Structure formats: C-alpha cells, structure tokens
Amino acid sequence: MKLSKIILSEANYTPYRAMVQVTSRDASPSVLADLIRALPGVTTCTIANSDDATNKYIFKVKIITQKTAATAFESLKKNALSKYMEVNTFNVASKSVERMKTPGEY
C-alpha cells in the first residue's frame, strides 16, 4: 500500500488548487515560488505568469487541508504576508479555486 493512501485514509484531507497573484519589490518569481512551497499545506507551486515591469507574479498553488477551501487559502495568505518580508501582496483568485481528486477517487 502506498504511503499516500495510508495517510489519506487516516485523516480526511482535501486537495485544492488556485491561482495566486503575488507582488514583490525584492524577490524573483523563482524565489517567491520557493517561499510559497515552504508554507504549511502547500504541495506544489508553479509559476504561471510573471510581469517584471509591475513586479506581479501569478502562481498555480496546490494545497492539502482539512479546512474549507476559503479558510485554507485565507490562512495561506496570512502566513505568506506575516512570514515573508519579500511578499507585499498575496491575492487568491476565488473563482479559480477548485477541489482536486484524492488518490482514492481516481
């Protein structure tokens, strides 16, 4: 049995993904992606778009949580803004939030 199946069978975790816009004066998109990946609950973070002229970067972020999607992404936003001085704004596109299938649902 795979470890992911054991973990997911023990607790009720739900995976979500959403598009996130981050503004930063100091950090490059790859550094910001690494910082986002280090936040609790984040499983993947990929760069979707970057605009160096305005320092706005868009990421596709996948998380796993026991909370609702809105609560989990709000917590992610608070963590990013409080832990990292490099992050000036952190906006989750609420229309892009979607629930993903768990490994047992395929």
Predicted regions and their residues:
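Short glycine-/aliphatic-rich beta-strand segments at the starts of folded cytosolic domains
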Residues: 12-24
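Helix N-cap motif at beta-to-alpha junctions
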Residues: 25-26, 62-70
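Short, flexible N-terminal segments of the mature chain
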Residues: 29-51
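Short, low-order "capping/linker" segments at domain edges
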Residues: 57, 61-62, 66, 96-106
